[in-house]
Regions:
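Active-site mouth loops of central-metabolism enzymes
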Residues: 1-7, 49
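Catalytic P-loop NTPase motifs of RecA-like helicase/translocase cores
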Residues: 5, 31-32
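Extended hydrophobic packing segments that form well-structured cores
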Residues: 155-166
């Protein structure tokens, strides 16, 4: 929901979509308000996820301490790179919480999820993938819904300098 709802409307929408048995309801409350998310989480039959739009470790800590989400969503392109995302994954692990990628950039984030014990789903967000396809060579393509980590050095893809020059 991209942090777009107040608590009342988030609850109403969650109740309406619960029969669809979705995996989780992503960032329903404005500004990822940990207190309001925790209250919402206690009242819902579906899991909540959050953090894809967060960039600071203490914001993830607050989501965990308040038990505001079931699934934490660090993103290496938004939240301070791989070092910060690994720290957040470690915090989540200490709270027995899985992580999932939200906010796209799967070719970057799949490496985080493949490298931590609580890594999980990686969102194949089409607009972000299209941007990556225009800027990089050697990107991994999904096969039957799965991305395979490359065995080449680094992230497994290279910057297309000609595309950047254009």
């Amino acid at each position: 929901a991209n942090c777009s709802l107040d608590a009342y409307h988030a609850f109403q929408l969650a109740q309406a979509i619960a029969p669809a048995r979705i995996g989780f309801f992503e960032e329903p409350i404005a500004e990822n308000d940990a207190r309001l998310l925790a209250d919402l989480r206690r009242r819902l039959p579906i899991q909540l996820a959050g953090g894809q739009n967060e960039g600071l470790a203490h914001r993830f800590r607050d989501l965990l301490v308040h038990q505001a989400v079931d699934v934490l969503q660090p993103n290496v392109t938004i939240g301070g790179g791989f070092t910060q995302a690994v720290r957040v994954a470690g915090m989540a692990s200490a709270f027995n919480s899985p992580i999932a990628n939200g906010g796209g950039w799967p070719c970057h984030n799949m490496h985080l999820h493949g490298g931590v014990e609580n890594g999980g789903l990686v969102e194949y967000h089409h607009p972000a993938v299209v941007v990556c396809q225009q800027l990089f060579n050697g990107l991994t393509e999904p096969v039957d819904g799965w991305l395979t980590l490359p065995e080449t050095p680094g992230l497994g893809f290279d910057l297309d300098r000609d595309a950047v020059a254009e």
